[in-house]
Amino acid sequence: MSKRKICIVSATRAEWYLLRNLCHEIQNDKDLSLQIIATGAHLSPEFGLTYKEIEKEFKITKKIPILLANDDKISLCKSMSLAFSAFSDAFEDLKPDMVVILGDRYEMLSVASVCLLMHIPLVHLCGGELTLGAIDDSIRHSISKMSHLHFVSHEIYKKRLLQLGEEEKRVFNIGSLASTIIKNMNFLNKKDLEKALEMKLDKELYLITYHPLTLNVKNTQKEIKTLLKKLDTLKNASLIFTKANADENGLLINEILQNYCQKNSHKAKLFDNLGSQKYLSLMKIAKAMIGNSSSGISESPFFKTPCINIGDRQKGRLRTQNIIDSEINDLDQAFEKLESKEFKQNLKNFKNPYDNGKNPNKIIKTCLKNVNLDTILHKNFIDL
């Protein structure tokens, strides 16, 4: 019997970090054949050519460049158009039995649309979540409706997919994909981090990731400058920045951060891509995470590291007690709360809702192996 071909598509470093262990599970199974397509920011020098991280462990089946030089609305639309055409050709060539994508990126909306029209079963990871301050929210729900199997990180997100009419037999709550990564991570100590980053970490460490405001792009420059102004007031601080993603105004944010770090090289450094080991090791020892990244919401709870979450970009996602939500103009109050006795006490006792003790990648792989492909495309809509 021929092996079932599973095609994993990844466009960003954040996606790959969560998909990597699943790829190992698939590759090590005698009944499955792994295909990997790298696209989007993975192939961009601006974002660190992160496809090279994939190639350290896997053979990339196809590389599909779709990013244009600019990141305005028109360029993003044209990138989606390029993706639609290129993935049509890729899937016609590879003939995958199933395609697996993660999350809510605009690139994946093109991939999902191609799968729909080509009658390829689509598996969606991390659906059912909310990010009401970003266009990602609409993209995520749209992808879910075009998908045939769903693997979510919490029961709340499972219920939301059922609200969208999905059949319960197609939706699996597997907990956070980050859980096994973090539990099995060989963390770097501070000395090893200093060597790897070429930076002294003898001050209070802040890990900062700030992405574009896709529903409020006009305020992006103002908000990032307001954040940097606040960071300038921190005494005895080491500031580690990671680059913004490939959304509209991502390049603008990265240029501002680059200039800031050059002027403040004694305390600040910007990285294209830290990689999961360095990133999680920094998260573990940081005084706080700052920004509007989903990792601050869903991964910092594993370490009980405080996270100052700025603005509405992650609005709607499940919160834990280590999260301090703040508007950009209320950062003084957020840092006051960070130092409060009550907040520090709460950090000791909260339960992480993203860790349910399961091995998510084994669950996904088992479903990919055993699902009936003859009937999977025929979906029902379940009314509440």
UniProtKB/Swiss-Prot annotation:
Task: Show the catalytic activity.
Answer: GDP-N,N'-diacetylbacillosamine + H2O = 2,4-diacetamido-2,4,6-trideoxy-alpha-D-mannopyranose + GDP + H(+); UDP-N,N'-diacetylbacillosamine + H2O = 2,4-diacetamido-2,4,6-trideoxy-alpha-D-mannopyranose + UDP + H(+)
EC number in record: 3.2.1.184
Listed under GO biological process in this entry are: bacterial-type flagellum organization; carbohydrate biosynthetic process; UDP-N-acetylglucosamine metabolic process
The alphabetical list of record keywords is: Bacterial flagellum biogenesis, Hydrolase
Q: Which SUPFAM superfamilies match?
A: UDP-Glycosyltransferase/glycogen phosphorylase (SSF53756)
Question: This protein's superkingdom?
Answer: Bacteria
Q: Does the keyword Transit peptide apply?
A: no
Record keywords: NAD included? no
Alphabetical list of InterPro entries matching this protein? UDP-GlcNAc_Epase, UDP_GlcNAc_Epimerase_2_dom, WecB-like
Q: Which GO terms describe its molecular function?
A: GDP-2,4-diacetamido-2,4,6-trideoxy-alpha-D-glucopyranose hydrolase/2-epimerase activity; hydrolase activity, hydrolyzing O-glycosyl compounds; UDP-N,N'-diacetylbacillosamine 2-epimerase activity
Concerning Pfam families, the annotation shows:
Epimerase_2 (PF02350)
Q: What does this protein do?
A: Involved in biosynthesis of legionaminic acid (5,7-diamino-3,5,7,9-tetradeoxy-D-glycero-D-galacto-non-2-ulosonic acid)(Leg), a sialic acid-like derivative that is incorporated into flagellin via O-linkage to Ser/Thr. Catalyzes the conversion of GDP-N,N'-diacetylbacillosamine (Bac2Ac4Ac) into 2,4-diacetamido-2,4,6-trideoxymannose and GDP. It can also use UDP-N,N'-diacetylbacillosamine however it generates small quantities of 2,4-diacetamido-2,4,6-trideoxymannose.
Q: Which family does it belong to?
A: Belongs to the UDP-N-acetylglucosamine 2-epimerase family.
PANTHER family per the record? Answer: UDP-N-ACETYLGLUCOSAMINE 2-EPIMERASE
Instruction: Kindly provide the name given to this protein in its UniProt entry.
Output: GDP/UDP-N,N'-diacetylbacillosamine 2-epimerase (hydrolyzing)
Q: Which organism is it from?
A: Campylobacter jejuni subsp. jejuni serotype O:2 (strain ATCC 700819 / NCTC 11168)
**Gene expressing this chain:** legG
